[in-house]
């Protein structure tokens, strides 16, 4: 009886203190039609970002009705990712309270989240905190594995422990478990007698791209209709509907891989639409006629843009509109090289040849484009692009990170092990961190060691190099492993390493302290190594700079985070594919505050395109 009184007192107190706000539903009407929205996605090997562009019709004002895609953490919804977020993916079930309360209300799906994976900071945090060693709970980026359509051997796991069983649950949950099979294939694409839901989640690594795109779609759908977005971009009484999904791709992506990417995007749209109840669950989704059965219009997919060309458009648009006030003729005339003869039939100063190098996480892409003005004048000039040359290499920032780990981090650890008395330190390192080829608990622990120990230290070295004083010959990094780790590895990883160290140490030796391992890196030596071709990235940079030099370009644009490294900049200046004053580093490029990814009047480093 007393507990009932306490409960009623508590409820009455909450009722007095917390006023439930008025709930307002927004729908399209004749006076407030739905506003079409285009979503541009750049899914990279290392980082991902997106741009939302609303079409306000006659009220359009350049790029002012745009917003960066914001990914919200579902486990800590008060946190939003930075606009440029990691492409890491982790399986994690979205929970919105206790399910049986929803069932008692008469609806078993009161809250539906059409995805069972997390991306960005939440995925990284889940991976760093993972304690289980059965199977895998995620991957560094689905983009790397688009071609791998073979079901995995071990079941995928959710990365959080079940409090009752102390094991990680299998990575399958409502609503997606009823929309795909064990291999990750959507059921609506299969014959009726083969439509079995998920029992053993052995999704191929390629289908994880479908999962990632489902999560990004769900985040985008929530954002475009959020009160905050509608108030910021205008016309808050009008709902928003996705019209087009635009995927930017690296130049180096083969045609077959592009088609797989398109298929994954199509599957993600279908799964999200069916999970939300917007399209009949068992109906096919392939044709436009079948998609018209949807309650909410189905967006179209466009995949015509390559990443290097996107970087050129950022620069071209901003120069013409902002810096030259729409006077495109003056813009072209001021930058055209006087030492290059104009093409036949083209007046001098009415054409530009622009090259761009986009150094991403997984690919280095280059594009050379000829831009021609028509016969108009002032603000009525039309610019016609013609792609002259395009190339891409699957060598980029990830390879630079690997080089740093192999050149500086691993040798520092091996040296300290030898000083501690371990005679065959190289053999110990090989057994701990080498690839045995087996899929077992040791393999999972090796992956977690790389993720939780070596990669954060490697990133710390690159970040220090990026912000260093290039004119200081003594600049460098002098720290311990512990100094460079913002978050210590999990207990499982530490036990894995410490047991191996203790076993290899001579009897009576002092305890080996991993966090006290000293690291000394000279940034001048790193720059010299890049110039000498000792970094993997140097070879593709030599190749693309040679091509750019052959075309006598007017401007060279450098985009992507690795392009900020002093060694990379020194190498490009040394190769000098265009005069140094004609190289534009987009990480320092000035734009208006309203420009997407603008921070303090400059484009945020990384996804300059």
Predicted regions and their residues:
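Extended alpha-helical coiled-coil/bundle linker/stalk regions that scaffold oligomerization
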Residues: 420, 424-606
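Phosphate/ATP-binding catalytic cores across multiple sugar-kinase/actin-like superfamilies
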Residues: 15-30, 34, 208-237, 312-345, ...
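Phosphate-binding glycine-rich/basic clefts of nucleotide- and phosphate-handling proteins
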Residues: 62-63, 68-154, 251, 368-510
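Conserved phosphate-binding/catalytic loops in two-lobed NTP-binding clefts
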Residues: 270-306, 310, 572-606
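Gly/Thr-rich phosphate-binding beta-strand-loop-beta motif of the actin/hexokinase/Hsp70
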Residues: 29-59, 163-171, 320-380, 558
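Short, small-residue-biased leader/transition segments that mark boundaries at the very start
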Residues: 1, 5-7, 609
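Conserved phosphate-binding loops in N-terminal lobes of ATP-dependent enzymes
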Residues: 88-248
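Glycine-rich phosphate-binding loops at beta-strand->alpha-helix junctions
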Residues: 239-260, 553-572
């Amino acid at each position: 009886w007393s507990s009932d009184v306490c409960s009623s007192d508590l409820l009455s107190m909450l009722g007095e203190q917390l006023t439930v706000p008025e709930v307002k539903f927004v729908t399209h009407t004749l006076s407030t039609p739905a506003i079409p929205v285009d979503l541009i996605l750049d899914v990279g090997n290392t980082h991902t970002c997106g741009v939302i562009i609303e079409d306000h019709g006659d009220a359009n004002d350049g790029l002012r009705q745009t917003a960066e895609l914001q990914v919200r953490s579902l486990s800590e919804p008060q946190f939003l990712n930075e606009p440029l977020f990691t492409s890491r993916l982790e399986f994690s079930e979205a929970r919105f309270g206790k399910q049986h309360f929803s069932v008692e209300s008469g609806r078993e799906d009161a809250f539906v989240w059409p995805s069972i994976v997390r991306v960005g900071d939440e995925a990284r945090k889940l991976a760093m905190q993972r304690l289980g060693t059965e199977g895998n709970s995620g991957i560094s980026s689905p983009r790397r594995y688009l071609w791998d359509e073979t079901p995995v051997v071990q079941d995928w796991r959710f990365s959080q422990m079940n409090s009752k069983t102390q094991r990680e649950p299998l990575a399958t949950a409502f609503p997606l478990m009823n929309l795909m099979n064990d291999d990750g294939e959507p059921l609506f694409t299969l014959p009726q007698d083969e439509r079995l839901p998920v029992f053993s989640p052995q999704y191929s690594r390629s289908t994880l791209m479908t999962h990632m795109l489902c999560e990004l779609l769900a985040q985008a759908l929530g954002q475009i209709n959020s009160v905050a977005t509608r108030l910021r971009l205008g016309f808050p009484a009008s709902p928003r509907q996705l019209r087009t999904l635009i995927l930017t791709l690296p130049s180096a992506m083969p045609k077959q891989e592009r088609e797989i990417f398109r298929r994954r995007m199509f599957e993600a749209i279908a799964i999200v639409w069916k999970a939300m109840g917007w399209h009949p669950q068992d109906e096919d989704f392939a044709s436009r006629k079948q998609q018209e059965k949807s309650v909410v219009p189905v967006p179209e997919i466009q995949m015509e843009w390559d990443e290097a060309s996107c970087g050129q458009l950022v620069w071209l648009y901003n120069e013409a509109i902002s810096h030259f006030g729409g006077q495109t003729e003056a813009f072209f005339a001021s930058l055209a090289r006087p030492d290059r003869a104009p093409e036949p039939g083209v007046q001098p100063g009415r054409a530009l040849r622009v090259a761009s190098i986009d150094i991403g996480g997984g690919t280095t892409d280059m594009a050379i484009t000829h831009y021609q003005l028509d016969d108009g004048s002032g603000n009525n000039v039309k610019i016609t692009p013609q792609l002259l040359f395009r190339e891409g290499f699957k060598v980029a920032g990830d390879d630079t990170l690997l080089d740093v780990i192999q050149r500086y981090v691993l040798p520092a650890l091996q040296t300290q092990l030898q000083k501690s008395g371990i005679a065959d330190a190289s053999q110990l390192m090989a057994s701990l961190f080498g690839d045995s080829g087996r899929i077992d608990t040791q393999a999972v622990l090796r992956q977690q060691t790389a993720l939780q120990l070596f990669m954060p230290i490697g990133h710390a070295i690159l970040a220090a190099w990026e912000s260093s004083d290039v004119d200081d010959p003594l600049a460098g990094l002098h720290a311990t492993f512990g100094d460079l780790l913002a978050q210590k590895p999990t207990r499982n990883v530490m036990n894995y390493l410490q047991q191996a160290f203790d076993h290899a140490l001579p009897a009576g030796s002092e305890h080996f302290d991993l966090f006290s391992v000293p690291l000394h890196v000279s940034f001048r030596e790193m720059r010299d190594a890049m110039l000498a071709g000792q970094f993997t990235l140097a070879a593709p940079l030599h190749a693309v700079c040679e091509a750019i030099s052959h075309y006598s370009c007017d401007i060279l644009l450098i985009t992507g985070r690795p392009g900020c490294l002093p060694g990379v900049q020194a190498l490009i200046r040394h190769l000098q594919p265009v005069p140094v004053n004609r190289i534009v580093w987009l990480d320092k490029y000035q734009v208006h505050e309203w420009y997407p990814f603008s921070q303090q009047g400059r484009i945020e480093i990384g996804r300059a395109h």
